[in-house]
Amino acid sequence: MAVIWGFNLSEMSWSAFGHKKMFDRRWHLRKERFIVYQLAMLIGLAAECTATYSLSKYDSLHENIHNFSTSVSTTPASLHNHDIIAAAITTIVFCVLVATIFGADFFFLLFWPTRTYPRWYTFAKKALAVVITAGVGVAAIVSTIVITSHQAFISGVDEGSKAHLVEVYFRPPLVYSHWAQNIAWLVLLWITFVCTAASTIIMFIAAAYDAEFGPMPKTVSENNTETSEGTPIVMREGAGRPI
């Protein structure tokens, strides 16, 4: 098969997803990386979907109140809920980035575990992981503040019209903390932050190990005597590739 950017596509196979290969203990922290990466990506996806649902509902609420208000008032009403819209967008963006950075590392580790990467790539990967972790943390803090202490409000109409609009369009509620979906969004996002931080830490530890001993299996990189077939090999110090 073709080789793209140095990756031999013939090495990709469905068998790589099997338990025996995925959790092969010969590779340093391979099992742990797969577990925490998947937790960060999957729980992040759940947080992203919940935030997207909330964003969609509050955006529709804004339009519905504006359009319906002309039937109960001479002036159109405006719903002010930009805070939760901004919090949802921030959550969505950083959860997508979590899936991008750790998803890429997941598949590289899955299909090409012995590949050695240039230093600039390792540095960029670690730097992006730190930035994304910080971004998820910021998204979690902002979302917590908005959902637990803020609420949307209506302007442009009298109090009677406001009450009627709220009665007609009661869901999602103007008080963000009164909606279970928003609470679920917060819980999932904080769990995502913890898993993302753990993924970043274990990525740093694995990168340091690979820089010192190379990405070869422990039976090769530590014993450094012969392969599983009994063929002698010599390892270049720190490179992680047989010569």
Provide a role label for each language-model segment.
Residues 59-60, 94-95, 152:
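Short low-complexity stretches enriched in small and charged residues
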Residues 11, 30-47, 51, 85-149, ...:
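Signature of small four-pass
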Residues 60, 107, 160-165, 199:
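Short, highly charged low-complexity linear segments
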Residues 1-37, 46, 50-74, 111-115, ...:
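Intrinsically disordered terminal tails
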Residues 21-29, 72-91, 168-184:
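Juxtamembrane membrane-interface segments at transmembrane-helix boundaries in membrane proteins
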